[in-house]
């Protein structure tokens, strides 16, 4: 949820943010009206409760002659208080709905526009020049790494098996990511992948993108599409001590996405699938530290990409392509030779205080135990995921159909070269 102080002091800033996202700026006026109505309802209810309390005291001290009139007034006030409390509850509900409808306020400098309006911040390496390159699925099948056919037989479209050295390649990649995270002060975590509705909603994934989320109806639980979700809920309703700096966690989990809005897109291979594995960095910090921490997350992502030795670019994602929780997002996109374009491998988002406000995650300024709790900031960033296999296989392929294993992954895979294998049963 957005900061009400900003809304009240500078509503035009929130309107501009909505417009840059391509979202409805009139929602800002609806929230302002709901905020005013809520405060008025609270004031009315408080006034009536105070009058009711005073009237109750008067009844006790009244003479027999005065008591009937005072009792009648007390009864009338009780009915008015009940009605006022009902009106307050309705106003609170309307306010909460209006508050939840507004996306995070975009940070100044984020490009306006939609998916194609990003700004390129950096390009690293030259696009790999290959004559008649094979795509990652052809390579994965010929090398005995990926089995889409049996994945579809067992689970349906957009499922797969990683087999043999394909499994080792992914496990090595994720272990490398976790190792880098630990070296930089992250606490490794293996979180639950089923979460309660309030946690999923708190991270902002039950709004416009609710159809992308798997729900276990019998238990009223959701399968997570990223370990960002359970890690954001980890400190819900807590007051943190950030006096020693940010709290950093690295979650390793399977992730699940319905891809309901992606019909017909990336149907070949493991670019867009229903289940994948990922190491996700998640950070709690003070709002003042958030932008610097965002740059640090991007730096660690770039370090991981350097280790897998692929050309990539960094983009500043346009406001209209941001999720509702993100105030700014950087993507690192690797070159995919068979598509002759860059595809997203990592994203890192600065969610400012948006998620923490929903989840009631606070900190005490300066670590002062008596200080007033403040809303924390949260950030997240991919450190390694299944999709990276696409970039590794395609960029390191050789004319004979083999694939060179990036040096950093050789100890995990057990070989420097992946070579075609014969068909198996």
Swiss-Prot record:
ATP binds at residues 257-259, 273, 344-347. Its EC number is 6.1.1.11. GO terms for biological process: selenocysteine biosynthetic process; seryl-tRNA aminoacylation. It comes from the Bacteria. Pathway: Aminoacyl-tRNA biosynthesis; selenocysteinyl-tRNA(Sec) biosynthesis; L-seryl-tRNA(Sec) from L-serine and tRNA(Sec): step 1/1. It is found in: Cytoplasm. The keyword Aminoacyl-tRNA synthetase applies. InterPro entries: aa-tRNA-synt_IIb (IPR002314), aa-tRNA-synth_II (IPR006195), aa-tRNA-synth_II/BPL/LPL (IPR045864), Ser-tRNA-ligase_type_1 (IPR002317), Ser-tRNA-synth_1_N (IPR015866), SerRS_1_N_sf (IPR042103), SerRS_core (IPR033729), tRNA-bd_arm (IPR010978). It catalyses: tRNA(Ser) + L-serine + ATP = L-seryl-tRNA(Ser) + AMP + diphosphate + H(+); tRNA(Sec) + L-serine + ATP = L-seryl-tRNA(Sec) + AMP + diphosphate + H(+). Disulfide bonds: none annotated. One of its GO terms (molecular function) is serine-tRNA ligase activity. Gene3D superfamilies: Bira Bifunctional Protein, Domain 2 (3.30.930.10), Serine-tRNA synthetase, tRNA binding domain (1.10.287.40). GO terms for cellular component: cytoplasm. L-serine binds at residues 226-228, 280, 382. Pfam families: Seryl_tRNA_N, tRNA-synt_2b. SUPFAM superfamilies: Class II aaRS and biotin synthetases (SSF55681), tRNA-binding arm (SSF46589). Keywords: Aminoacyl-tRNA synthetase, ATP-binding, Cytoplasm, Ligase, Nucleotide-binding, Protein biosynthesis. HAMAP family: Ser_tRNA_synth_type1. Belongs to the class-II aminoacyl-tRNA synthetase family. Type-1 seryl-tRNA synthetase subfamily. Catalyzes the attachment of serine to tRNA(Ser). Is also able to aminoacylate tRNA(Sec) with serine, to form the misacylated tRNA L-seryl-tRNA(Sec), which will be further converted into selenocysteinyl-tRNA(Sec). NCBIfam families: serS. Consists of two distinct domains, a catalytic core and a N-terminal extension that is involved in tRNA binding. Homodimer. The tRNA molecule binds across the dimer. This is Serine--tRNA ligase. It comes from Mycobacterium avium (strain 104).
């Amino acid at each position: 949820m957005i900061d009400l102080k900003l809304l009240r002091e500078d509503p035009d800033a929130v309107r501009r943010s909505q417009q840059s996202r391509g979202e409805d700026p009139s929602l800002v006026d609806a929230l302002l009206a709901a905020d005013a109505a809520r405060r008025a309802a609270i004031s009315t209810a408080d006034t009536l409760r105070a009058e009711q309390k005073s009237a109750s005291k008067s009844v006790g001290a009244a003479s027999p002659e005065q008591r009937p009139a005072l009792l009648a007034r007390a009864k009338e006030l009780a009915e008015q208080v009940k009605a006022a409390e009902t009106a307050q509850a309705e106003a609170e509900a309307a306010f909460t709905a209006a508050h939840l409808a507004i996306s995070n306020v975009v940070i100044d400098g984020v490009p306006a526009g939609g998916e194609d309006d990003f700004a390129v911040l950096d390009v690293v390496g030259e696009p790999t020049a290959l004559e008649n390159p094979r795509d990652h699925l052809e390579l994965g099948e010929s090398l005995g790494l990926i089995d889409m056919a049996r994945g579809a037989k067992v689970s349906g479209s957009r499922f797969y098996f990683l087999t043999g050295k394909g499994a080792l390649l992914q496990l090595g990649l994720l272990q490398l990511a976790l190792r880098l995270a630990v070296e930089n002060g992250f606490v490794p975590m293996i979180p639950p992948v089923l979460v309660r509705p309030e946690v999923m909603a708190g991270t902002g994934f039950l709004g416009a993108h609710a159809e992308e989320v798997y729900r276990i109806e019998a238990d009223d639980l959701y399968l997570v599409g990223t370990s960002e979700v359970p890690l954001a809920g980890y400190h819900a309703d807590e007051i943190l001590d950030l006096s020693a700096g940010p709290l950093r966690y690295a979650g390793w989990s399977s992730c699940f996405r319905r891809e309901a809005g992606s019909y017909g897109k990336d149907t070949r291979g493991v670019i867009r699938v229903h289940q994948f594995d990922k190491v996700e960095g998640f950070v709690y910090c003070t709002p003042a530290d958030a932008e610097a921490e965002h740059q640090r997350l991007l730096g660690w992502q770039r370090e991981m990409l350097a280790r897998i030795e692929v050309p990539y670019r960094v983009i500043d994602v346009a406001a209209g392509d941001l999720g509702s929780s993100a105030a700014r997002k950087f993507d690192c996109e690797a070159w995919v030779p068979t598509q002759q374009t860059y595809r997203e491998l990592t994203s890192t988002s600065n969610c400012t205080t948006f998620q923490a406000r929903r989840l009631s995650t606070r900190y005490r300024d300066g670590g002062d135990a008596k200080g007033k709790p403040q809303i924390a900031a949260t950030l997240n960033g991919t450190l390694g995921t299944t999709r990276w296999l696409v970039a590794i296989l395609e960029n390191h392929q050789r004319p004979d159909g083999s694939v060179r294993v990036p040096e950093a992954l050789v100890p995990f895979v057990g070989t420097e070269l992946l070579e075609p294998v014969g068909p198996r049963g």
